[in-house]
Amino acid sequence: MIAPNHLERDFSATAPKQKWVTDITEFKAKDGSKVYLSPILDLFNNEIVSYNLSYSPNWAQVEDMLMQAVKGLNKACGVILHSDQGWQYQMVAYRRILAEHGIIQSMSRK
């Protein structure tokens, strides 16, 4: 499922926990192996809310990163979490975790 684009390229925030963004980035390690970083960034102050490093871009990586981010999150805050349309962000399990914690899903357009 593709979520609406709630950010509409407005990457500014006036307070913490208004707008978060996430993606998975591939890096090459010194030994030639690939490492994948999955962070959540708060657009208010560019702080990393949570992150996970993995040797493969899999659901467990995204789930761990997301569960770190929701610890202590007030469901009423209504934070927007924006991503691309990657398969991880379209999963039912991902959308369920967002809904359970009052997070509004947003996706960019291709």
Q: What name fits each language-model region?
A:
Residues 1-110:
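Charged DNA-binding/catalytic regions of mobile-element recombinases
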